[in-house]
Amino acid sequence: MLKTPLYESHIAANAKMVDFSGWSMPINYGSQIQEHNNVREDCGIFDVSHMLAVDIQGSEAEKFLRYLLANDVAKLQENKAQYGCMLNHDAGIVDDLITYKVTDEHFRIVVNAGNRESDVAWFNQNAQNFDVAITPQTDLAIVAVQGPKAVAVIKRVVTKEIAAEIEALLPFSFKFFSKWMVARTGYTGEDGFEVILPATQVKKFWDSLLENGAQPAGLGARDTLRLEAGMHLYGADMDTSTTPLERGLGWSVDLSDEHRDFIGKKAYLAKKAQGVDTKWVGVVLKTKGVLRAGQEIDFDNGEKGYITSGSFSPTLKVAIGLAYVPKQADNPVVNIRGKELEVELVKPKFVKNGKSLI
């Protein structure tokens, strides 16, 4: 099994390790709910070095990414980041990822752990007619520093000059400090940063964060935090069999430049014209119980919906989920252990900056 550069640190902290896409990763360090609440109220740190940073460089880097991605990197200024989907020719989602613009000829993309090899292969397959170099940065580590006190903690572990520059970063902006890249991005619905740095330096950085008030958090808390924030998990909420239209991600497909072609555009436009017969929603269980991926939602007209992600919400203290359901249907219920339990359909975002949105 693959190990991140922080593997020994997790073992020393008595983390419960699990297999995640072939990587030995911490699911929790004792209490998933405590780790979750700490990110909502204070500062938690995550080892996400199983994800991969890939640099796209060359005179046609922007041209290539305008073709490769459904969102339009031409709208990005330097030192800004953009969320988007990479589609196949049928408009199915190959991956969702964040693209960072360093210069006109240098972009960095961070891809999901489970898609590392397939994404890089897709990049290379589609780059053959472009003047670009694709470089997976396998010698880098990634640490997410998340929570309302993330700024305070990170300021304690860097110099005063760097602290001021980090604090000034706006959401979805980033800056390089030598080989370190600090971005004001995250996957929790809280303020925070994702730091991409040389693997040889990550243990010292991790330890200094812990010494200055941060608490480690595992993949369990990462999942409940992103679910509360209404953020998609690739492989659970979407995959190549789904288009952005069916998963509430149409906003991330940029169609404003009608002359731009991108992979999947033709199929996407056809699907858009045809219309989708489902909508992407949040689900809240009205009674005690747990919502899980794969559960059916039944409606009084006989139609069904399906939950793609579900869990107990530590912040809201109820079971929540993300689901696709028929556009017109009433009185939703889920069947849990033979009982029909009422659920409420809400916007697919439950918590932001520690506050309930439902």
Curated annotation (Swiss-Prot):
Cited NCBIfam families: gcvT (TIGR00528), PRK00389.1 (NF001567)
Subunit note: The glycine cleavage system is composed of four proteins: P, T, L and H.
Family (UniProt): Belongs to the GcvT family.
Molecular-function annotations in GO: aminomethyltransferase activity; transaminase activity
Enzyme Commission number, as recorded: 2.1.2.10
Transmembrane regions: none
Keyword terms: Aminotransferase, Transferase
InterPro entries in UniProt: GCS_T (IPR006223), GCS_T_bac (IPR022903), GCST_C (IPR013977), GCV_T_N (IPR006222), GcvT/YgfZ/DmdA (IPR028896), GcvT/YgfZ_C (IPR029043), TrmE/GcvT_dom1 (IPR027266)
An example Gene Ontology CC term for this record: cytosol
Encoding gene per record: gcvT
Function: The glycine cleavage system catalyzes the degradation of glycine.
The name this protein goes by in its record: Aminomethyltransferase
GO terms for biological process, alphabetical: glycine decarboxylation via glycine cleavage system
